[in-house]
Amino acid sequence: MSEENQQPERQFAIQKLYVKDVSFETPNSPAVFTLKWEPKVEFNLGSKVQQLQEGLFEVSLSVTITVKLEEKTAYLVEICQAGIFTISGFPEQEMGPLLGSYCPNILFPYAREAVSDLVNKGGFPPMLLAPINFDALYMQQVQMAQQQAQPATPH
């Protein structure tokens, strides 16, 4: 069997996991600690991929949580959890799900832990983030991109 017919060996490895950016703000403290704890929570999530070199990618997961009491911001947490991943030998159609779903799924527990620690150290009740289905989010993004790419048809 010639080497030309062999597929490249698939390789996936975590090179480094790190906090790229973090912020915790309590703009209305200490007054906010006197209010009844009935929070309104806003949660935003995003991810970004950057190819560093052939087969080496940085994936970053951004989490922003704003908690309000009576329209006053109790706290705002922002974290960008990132990782550097070696990914090579995979077919092109598998790279999107790896970078858009699998890698963020690896990063999320670290971001969740950082959020929990920051909120606890800020003197607030625990903020426990539920697991996220990154496969479903990725598929939703793919479908939205496909819909936007299609020209509008008259009805």
Swiss-Prot record:
One Gene Ontology term, aspect cellular component: cytoplasm
UniProt keyword ATP-binding present: no
Molecular function as annotated in GO: unfolded protein binding
InterPro entries referenced in this protein's UniProt entry, alphabetically: SecB (IPR003708), SecB-like_sf (IPR035958)
UniProt-annotated location(s): Cytoplasm
The organism's place on the tree of life at top rank: Bacteria
Keywords tagged on the record: Chaperone, Cytoplasm, Protein transport, Translocation, Transport
One BP annotation, GO: protein transport
Pfam families, per the entry: SecB
Residues spanning the signal sequence: none
Role summary: One of the proteins required for the normal export of preproteins out of the cell cytoplasm. It is a molecular chaperone that binds to a subset of precursor proteins, maintaining them in a translocation-competent state. It also specifically binds to its receptor SecA.
PANTHER family, per database record: PROTEIN-EXPORT PROTEIN SECB (PTHR36918:SF1), PTHR36918
HAMAP family cross-referenced by the UniProt entry: SecB
Subunit structure of this chain's protein: Homotetramer, a dimer of dimers. One homotetramer interacts with 1 SecA dimer.
Family that this chain belongs to: Belongs to the SecB family.
Name of the featured protein: Protein-export protein SecB
Highest classification ranks of the organism: Bacteria, Pseudomonadati, Pseudomonadota, Gammaproteobacteria, Methylococcales
